[in-house]
Every structure is written in structure tokens, then in C-alpha cells.
Design a protein with these regions (language model features):
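Short beta-strand scaffold segments in enzyme catalytic cores
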Residues: 13, 37-41, 134-138, 144-145, ...
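Glycine/serine-rich anion-binding loops at beta->alpha junctions
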Residues: 86-115, 133, 243-259
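Conserved, helical-rich catalytic subdomain that frames metal- and/or nucleotide-binding sites
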Residues: 140, 145-245, 260-273, 277-288
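Short, basic/glycine-rich phosphate-binding loops at helix/coil junctions
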Residues: 45-59, 107, 207-217
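Contiguous, small/hydrophobic- and glycine-enriched helical/loop subdomains that border
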Residues: 104, 108-145
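Solvent-exposed alpha-helices and their adjacent loops that cap or buttress functional pockets
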Residues: 31-32, 129-130, 136-139, 157-163, ...
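ATP-binding N-lobe of GHMP and related small-molecule kinases
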Residues: 1-95, 113-125, 160-161, 171-174
């Protein structure tokens, strides 16, 4: 049994305030893309959970988000069943694409089926919130407004890129530690986010994607670009190569851009290879 784990990008991302618990309240628009990892599993009757990757990992199994998701679902449901899990990893980690969170969300969906638990999405999203802020959205995917630390979700009808447009995602060789992104990021208060959300929701489906693509925004660019100029350079290269718009995703370091055709996006991907470790041409994924 297999499950697709689509990555995500942020079409809009603002930092509203720092909370007393040390976390930050955000306002963002999540969008899944038709690119990601694949999680497979086979049933075990002895209750054991094993995890194998297509490439070596250098951290303990107990700290792996896929393993944590499997154990959490097993404990929550009380099932005596286990699973042999295999993860085909394609998306880069720590790239602002939600790769690890997507894998955890896919694991929840997959084992819910394998163990015949019949949990609804809402229950899986609740469990996902215990694993990470992006996991609840990635249980369902598609298009959603998110607030709080990302756990307060308003799903909207999924959108798709207009016409023959394609998305190019590229990840530079530089990595952006989360602390670098949050250090110095401006806290805007709620006004910009609330205004953006209201205008986007008032638009119809076609108008809303046009509005979103014309109003791409990521507050983290202000704090990331000075410390990680390769990310800023990559965004500039996207625009030089003909992207209609471009933006850093999440807290970095990946950048995405929209091109009018698949061929244009593929050509740009070739041009970006010298300054990036990962490139993929894709479209939006409409969710589960």
C-alpha cells in the first residue's frame, strides 16, 4: 500500500506577532504541489514498527517524524498491529517545502487505511497538530488559509494554475536555519494579513488565484536575504529567466516561480542547476 506525500509552498506568509510561549502567530496561504515523496507500508501482526529510507539517514529513529506519526496513531487507536514502512525520499529537507511534515501526514493517512481505523480527516489533523505545525494542513492538502502557528485552518476550494502555466521549484545549495529566518523578521500585526485574506476570499475561484499570484509575499525574505544572499540571487535568476512571479517558500531556502509554459519552466530549471541542489517542474496538487 502506498501514499503520496505532496510538498507545499506558501503563496503568502506574514509574521503577525511573537507570542508569550516563544512561538510566532502567522498568517499564510498553503498550497500543495504535485511533487513529493512516497510512503509505502506492509502490515505486521506483531505490533512492531520499522522504517527504511531509500537513502541513509544520520539521526535516531525515535526522532524521525514518520516514525513518530506511526507510533502516535498506534497508541491513540490502541491497535495491536504494526507496519514495515518504506519512505522514498525525493524532496529536500529543511527547504521550506514541508517535506518532513508531508511524510508524517502521509503516514497518518496510510496507516489509517492499513490498520482499518476509519478515522476521518479531522481526527488525523488533530493528531498531526501534535507532530508539527504544517502536518494538519498536509493531511488534506489543496489550498488553505492558516493562522496561529499554522494549525488554525480554513480550507477553500482548490485552485490550479491558469492555462498552461507551470511551477518551478528550486533549492539553492545554501541552507537557512529556522533561527536565522526568525531573527530580525518584522512583526507586522494583523492588518496586512486580514486585508489580504478578505480580498482573496471575496474573489471568485479564477480571480482568487490571479490575485494570489499578483500579490505573492513572504515576510521572511527581509531576514533571510541579507544572511543568505544565494537565496536572493536565486529569486532574481527566476525573474531574469522569465518567471511571471517568484517567491521564497516558507522560511527558506527554496524559491518557486510561475512560468507560462512547461517548456519555459524546464529550460529555466536547466539554467538554475549550477546554483541549486534540487529543481522540479510541476503544477498545483488539489488535495485528498
Amino acid at each position: 500500500m502506498k501514499e503520496f506525500a505532496p510538498a507545499k509552498i506558501n503563496l503568502f506568509l506574514d509574521v503577525i506577532r511573537k507570542r508569550e510561549d516563544g512561538y510566532h502567530d502567522l498568517g499564510t496561504v498553503f498550497q500543495t504541489v504535485d511533487a513529493g515523496d512516497t510512503v509505502s507500508a506492509e502490515l505486521r501482526a506483531d505490533g512492531r514498527i520499522t522504517l527504511c529510507y531509500n537513502e541513509p539517514q544520520d539521526y535516531p529513529l525515535e526522532s524521525d517524524l514518520v516514525f513518530k506519526a506511526a507510533k502516535l496513531l498506534q497508541q491513540e487507536s490502541g491497535t495491536t498491529l504494526g507496519a514495515d514502512i518504506y519512505l522514498k525520499k525525493i524532496m529536500p529537507l529543511g527547504a521550506g517545502l514541508g517535506g518532513g511534515s508531508a511524510d508524517a501526514a502521509a503516514t497518518l493517512r496510510l496507516l489509517n487505511q492499513l490498520w482499518k481505523l476509519k478515522y476521518k480527516n479531522e481526527k488525523l489533523e488533530e493528531l498531526g497538530a501534535r507532530l508539527g505545525a504544517d502536518v494538519p494542513f498536509l493531511v488534506r492538502g489543496g489550498t488553505a488559509f492558516a493562522e496561529g502557528i499554522g494549525e488554525k485552518l480554513t480550507f477553500v476550494k482548490s485552485v490550479q494554475l491558469p492555462g498552461e502555466a507551470h511551477l518551478l521549484i528550486a533549492t539553492p545549495h545554501d541552507a537557512v536555519p529556522t533561527k536565522d529566518a526568525y531573527a530580525g523578521v518584522p512583526k507586522s500585526g494583523p492588518d496586512r494579513w486580514e486585508s489580504y485574506k478578505a480580498k482573496c476570499l471575496r474573489a471568485g475561484k479564477t480571480a482568487s488565484i490571479d490575485f494570489a499570484l499578483k500579490n505573492l509575499f513572504n515576510a521572511f525574505e527581509v531576514s533571510v536575504f541579507p544572511k543568505h544572499p544565494l537565496v536572493e540571487e536565486m529569486k532574481a535568476e527566476f525573474l531574469r529567466l522569465g518567471a511571471k512571479c517568484a517567491l521564497m517558500s516558507g522560511s527558506g531556502a527554496s524559491v518557486f516561480g510561475i512560468f507560462e509554459t512547461r517548456e519555459q519552466a524546464k529550460q529555466a530549471a536547466e539554467e538554475l542547476k549550477p546554483i541549486s541542489r534540487y529543481q522540479i517542474v510541476t503544477r498545483f496538487f488539489e488535495g485528498f
